[in-house]
Amino acid sequence: DNTLSVDSIDGFSMLFNLKKFKDQNFFDENFFLYLENNDLCLRVKQKNENIFVVTNAMINHKGSISLSENLEYLRNWHWMWSKFYFNKKHYGFFVAIKNIFLNFISALIKYFFYLIIFKNKKKKIYEMRIKGIINALIGKKSWFRL
């Protein structure tokens, strides 16, 4: 047997029985870049459906591209926004705050550290993480684009 039952899979190669999604949205369009596959897999499991990995499948995934500075900023903003949104959606506002708190404190400390030592690129990365968290906290949609 070349299938393995799992709770979640990465989204770069997924196949679905779309008939099972007639009664609900497929991907949550509020997500952008991160955790949309985790959200979908969690909803599938909550419906007592199965997720399988084909263990001998071969996928040619051309990854590992270098990111421009602006894409790096976008990525960091959306990672933090999506992490908060995912936790809020599935576990509630206070659990989301608890789960993002250390990320927020870490980003603040690193932001000020890189500000003091004049590392502007690194400072901007942590600024974008802070902004992503704040936007999620105040209920703004995942709006940041380049």
What is the role of each PLM region?
Residues N2-F26, N30-M58:
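A short, conserved alpha-helix in the catalytic core of glycosyltransferases
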Residues N2-N17, E69-F104:
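Extended, non-globular alpha-helical segments
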Residues K19, D23, R43, Y85, ...:
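Residue-level signal for well-ordered alpha-helical scaffold segments within enzymatic catalytic domains
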Residues F31, D39-L42, W81, Y85-F86, ...:
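Hydrophobic side chains within alpha-helical segments
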Residues F31-Y34, E69-N76, K123:
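Flexible, glycine- and charge-enriched loops at secondary-structure boundaries
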Residues K47, L67-S68:
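Short, glycine/charged-enriched secondary-structure capping and boundary segments
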Residues L74-S82, F93-L146:
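Non-catalytic, C-terminal membrane-associated alpha-helical segments of glycosyltransferases
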